[in-house]
């Protein structure tokens, strides 16, 4: 099997394992009188473990081979999924249930962090630069198909056999990932750098451009994860939906994400990488507000669907352009870094930030829902995301868009295309208008007002000159 297909299916299965927990466990925990704040902690420790292991992933890749880590992680992820069902079904002690769930959520988080870092790093490394956005988009589609299938499996098998059956079924399916790992082991890559080590992550985190993008990842993930402890209960309580039906609402995020991913190239072409992130943040902020809308909008299941669709659709323009931006910034910071190491680092930083957002989201959502109610928690989270989207826009407006500059070129005709290269830091964004004075020998000085179009694949600007 082609390696890109193997990575796609591994990511899809990992998404299924991740998404089945949030619809089912909170409902079980509430029946066993576990507070929403504690439920949020149990959900979030997965991402805390994911964050820590991802931070050390480049060091682990030096000490252990990537392939061995992949074998262990895929086996562990499948086993933890089965154990969630067994523990939830047979452990009636309040403290035993919490302790064992937290322990295996940590193990699952560690496994998922290693799988995600390797899968994304290999995908972006094996793709040509012009195809990286599409390759990452396809990989994300695999993850989102998994996120959508998880709640469907939860809904169908919960109706058939209660809480335990969905976890037993999905855990058995996830053992397919162990087989897929053997395909990765057999595949030879052109660079033969699968077992090469990486430079430390920390030196890249001191750069403000990278930190600003990572904060966008963080708030994007908060928008998706803050209602994990509360949404199922909210839908059951206020709209009288059964657990099997309420579980399906988690799939709306994934479907909206997939649809947006299919059009991500068009979006980034029109808005640019930085503009796409800004628009994604705005859409996510208003989507969170719509999940429990304030007047004049009525409280309606239609608005819940619209809100979840906006959150899922807004996430894609944040994560995919952001990851491409990360990889480019890392190469600029360290021009000597090799392709695999650069993508290991960008993948690790991306996964760390998303895991931190996924860790904080359920805790924030559980706390606010417990103390202020679900309605207020939506308003608070939406406000924070909106404020950051404005700060993000101000920062990149001042750093990316370039003021007028004079550049001298010779020209042969009144209207022609010219390629501007080797001007580091001069042009950074789409459709910047500048005045260019062209001084030709034996020709009179003339002023032109060109339109610049930045070609991200070639990392240069193409210029159409027309005489004023």
Where do the model's predicted regions map?
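Helix-to-loop junctions at the C-terminal end of transmembrane segments
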Residues: 54-65, 260-272
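Conserved MFS/SLC helix-loop-helix module at the cytosolic interface between two early adjacent transmembrane helices
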Residues: 52-89
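Helix-loop-helix hairpin linking two adjacent transmembrane segments in secondary transporters
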Residues: 138-182
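Intracellular juxtamembrane helix-capping segments at the cytosolic ends
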Residues: 114-127, 317-335
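Extracytoplasmic gate region of multi-pass secondary transporters
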Residues: 21-23, 212-250
